[in-house]
A protein has these predicted regions:
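Extended, Lys/Arg-enriched charged tracts that mediate electrostatic binding to polyanionic substrates
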Residues: 110-128, 313
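Short secondary-structure junctions
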Residues: 126-131, 275-281, 316-323
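C-terminal structured interaction module
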Residues: 296, 300-347
Length: 347
């Protein structure tokens, strides 16, 4: 089963910068399905109004752009349509999204209800060459029923996603790649990573989501941790990064991942497993202090720095059994992170 999965994902590549590249050249991250559910539940709860539709449209627009610009999914006028449709359906399983059944207008074993609905809308429109209004009903955990109503208006292809200001934009000319470090076990609906069902998500889906919620009001009275200090970003971006960091930290805290750290190499091994090997970027440890007052200085180069930041903070706190103070400076090269014990003020 593992050999079959390795073949299925043989064209997915890992770079020395802690990113994963899918066959089309797009960057993706490897997410546990339950992890994503936990993250999304936390992240959405911060907002004053529901943002579920924002995630659907982020997934739909991103997949629409992918299908519309990758020549492998170009639908011929006469012969060869079936081959393209099979390739489209195979993409679902390869990415771990579930089984798309457009003829039956349903999704089997969806990775996530909102993501699945968004991806399905893009595939249905691409396959039929028309625009549709979509409604969906989750019959149970295994099936989503889709209802499509044709729209007459012409809408241009969704544009390429724009990276947020806090994501490093400098291109590295010398990229070396290797095969995926993770062992993935294939299933009929996707794959498992260890004991957990997992999926690949394009990072551009997150970029589209970020811009759709940037500046939206949070819940009244919501306050972020006083122990996270961020510099180098404007107010709206800082608030969004705080929300991303807090939600990814809570996502990690819900896991049972064990962290034991005595040396810098111990810490770097955990970073490789939880950050770099899953596409969240590269972390360079610049200073590591063990003992009774542990601290660490790092530089983070990540396509999703807000999520990676929360993971690093919660991992460090679990490793040392105590909360920490986090100081983060965003610049044009990376995010500089300093984690150290909280100062206790005695009155």
């Amino acid at each position: 089963m593992i050999d079959e999965a390795s073949s299925r994902h043989s064209e997915f590549l890992q770079t020395q910068f802690g990113t994963i590249i899918e066959p089309s050249g797009a960057k993706v991250i490897l997410f546990g399905v339950n992890e994503f559910n936990e993250w999304w539940s936390c992240f959405e709860s911060y907002y004053e109004a529901p943002i579920g539709r924002k995630l659907i449209y982020a997934a739909s627009d991103d997949e629409e752009h992918h299908l519309g610009t990758d020549t492998g999914y170009e639908i011929p006028k006469w012969f060869g349509k079936k081959t393209v449709f099979q390739r489209m359906n195979a993409r679902w399983i390869t990415m771990g999204w579930g089984v798309n059944a457009p003829l039956d207008a349903r999704i089997q074993s969806p990775c996530h209800d909102l993501l699945g609905a968004g991806f399905a809308l893009a595939h249905y429109e691409h396959q039929n060459g028309k625009r549709y209004q979509m409604e969906w009903r989750q019959l149970n955990s295994e099936f989503i029923k889709l209802d499509f109503t044709e729209k007459l208006d012409e809408i241009p292809l969704a544009p390429k996603a724009v990276m947020p200001a806090w994501v490093l934009k400098r291109e590295h000319p010398d990229v070396t790649t290797t095969n995926l470090e993770q062992e993935l076990e294939l299933r009929s609906f996707g794959f498992f990573m260890g004991r957990e069902r997992a999926m690949f998500l394009p990072i551009s889906v997150f970029y589209r989501l970020y811009y759709s919620v940037l500046g939206r009001p949070f819940q009244a009275g919501l306050k972020w941790s006083n122990n996270l200090h961020i510099e180098g970003l404007d107010h709206s971006s800082t608030s969004l990064v705080e929300a991303l960091s807090e939600s990814s930290a809570l996502m990690f805290k819900s896991s049972d991942y064990t962290i034991f750290v005595q040396t810098q190499s111990d810490w770097e091994a955990h970073i490789k497993t939880r950050i770099s090997a899953r596409g969240f970027g590269a972390v360079i440890v610049e200073e590591f202090v063990a003992g009774s007052s542990p601290s660490v200085r790092m530089s983070l180069n990540s396509p999703l720095p807000g999520l990676a930041l929360g993971l690093l903070i919660s991992m460090w706190e679990r490793a040392h059994g105590a909360p920490c103070t986090s100081e983060v400076i965003f610049n044009t090269e990376s995010a500089l992170i300093y984690l150290h014990p909280r100062k206790v003020e005695y009155i």
